[in-house]
Amino acid sequence: GKTTLPELCRTEKMTTKFNDSYPSDFSMQNNDQILEAIEHYLGQIGYPEEPGRLYAPISYSLTMSGRRLRPMLLMLTCGIFSDQPQAAMPAAAAVEVFHNFTLLHDDIMDNAAMRRGNPSVFAKWGQNVAILSGDAMLISAYRLLSEYPPQVLPQILARFTTMAIEVCEGLQYDMDIEPRES
């Protein structure tokens, strides 16, 4: 049968190689510490320098000042069910990378010049680069999820893929309701 989210969060199978990189006093009660851990983890993803026109927009997008609400909620939710919530960090990072991928494509669809008070990737590098960098971010999100052990990976990938499709469906419904500028 399918494993439920609480079961995924509290199982020892969720242990990843990243658990050892957290301080022993890591607390899910301290939102600033969680946010700092998320920022640190995102900074450690390590995109190559070349080709620069592919990876620079990804780094630019991920370093814009966002609230990191999605990964924060994922970490807090997993913390309810587990005494090792840091095991959820690869999934939290994948959700944030995926979210930023959707923003790159959304800016293209909206013809948006600005994102979070900065020039959008679309405005700064152009449509083709924004599409390709966004696509690389989507693939990178799946690569982050691949860090999980094979015992839980199929369930995690299935849930993530369902979420990704639902986000795309939501964007399409949004376009159907509110015509975009051409």
Predicted regions: what is each one?
Residues 2-3, 13-14:
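Polybasic, lysine-rich low-complexity intrinsically disordered segments
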Residues 18-45:
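N-terminal amphipathic/basic leader segments beginning at the initiator methionine
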Residues 43, 47-182:
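Mg2+-dependent prenyl diphosphate-binding active-site environment of isoprenoid biosynthetic enzymes
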